[in-house]
């Protein structure tokens, strides 16, 4: 897998132990149902909106700024970052907002 075939990286990245850490922002540019790799830390924003994602597995654990996964085919927030420094945008996905509300309360 070539990272640049799936993502536009604004900044630089490092691959360590199969996990990509990005010093900048990440934009998913290819339509996929699942991310083809695992991200650890993204210092700025992570954008995977308007896609076909059915899962957030592979998303970064840490996002320093915005995390935008709106308009996908998600049914769960499993795999969602544990830290998001700014807005978490996830509308037009979940059938039920119960899990989303629980996540916001937890945050």
Where are the model-predicted features located?
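LRR N-terminal entry segment and analogous cap-like coil->beta motifs
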Residues: 4-5, 13-54, 58, 62-65, ...
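GD-rich hexapeptide-repeat beta-solenoids
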Residues: 6-7, 97
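Leucine-rich solenoid repeat scaffolds
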Residues: 69, 75-107
């Amino acid at each position: 897998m070539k990272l640049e075939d799936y993502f536009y990286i604004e900044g630089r990245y490092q691959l360590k132990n199969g996990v990509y850490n990005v010093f900048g922002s990440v934009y998913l540019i290819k339509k996929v149902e699942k991310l083809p790799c695992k991200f650890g830390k993204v210092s700025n924003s992570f954008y995977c909106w308007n896609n076909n994602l059915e899962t957030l597995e592979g998303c970064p654990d840490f996002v320093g700024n915005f995390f935008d996964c709106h308009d996908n085919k998600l049914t769960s927030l499993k795999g969602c970052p544990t830290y998001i420094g700014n807005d978490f945008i996830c509308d037009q996905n979940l059938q039920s907002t119960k899990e989303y509300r629980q996540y916001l309360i937890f945050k």
